[in-house]
Amino acid sequence: YILPDNKNSRRVVLLDLHTTSAEGIAYTIATSTGGSRALAENLGVPVILDLDKAISGTTLNYFSEMELESFCFEAGQHEDEESVMRTVSAIWQMLVHVGCIESYKLPLFEDQKKVLHDLGKNLAGTVRYKYRHGIQPRDRFKMIAGFDNFQVIKKGQLLAHDRNGAIYAPFSGIMLMPLYQAQGKDGFFIVEEV
């Protein structure tokens, strides 16, 4: 058991840190619990709503079910060195935001904050989960090369192939987490602007 018996005795916040197999921008995934959305919006990158309802068995689900403030930060592609800097920036910003440390004690805080806020410029601030393309190993799913997170897609656009043939976008939207690795149960997601 990792939490105090009385969860109200102090504020517990979970910042769940990740990278993805696809290239693209950093973003956050907020839950419907408490201040999750406000915490996620603080980082200045796009916020995805309702995605936690489509993905079960995650750390984010666990903390959300316990009604604790939690959100996920996706820093970028696994191999991108900038993902490390984005993660560091997210951690420092969150520590300041929840009152663990004062920003003036961090000499590079404004630079760290700028790292993420510059990424969020000219992008949709908040998007909502719309579609999940679930897969299983026997499907032999293969995403078409070149899709990035937050890339606009059109209804009918070829996205992937599997053992049954071509997979086309069921509607227009924004691509999220196209799968470019061997493991996973999610081929891709489609989100839409709120």
Regions picked out by a protein language model, each given a short descriptive name:
Residues 1-194:
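Structured catalytic-domain cores with a bias toward divalent-metal coordination
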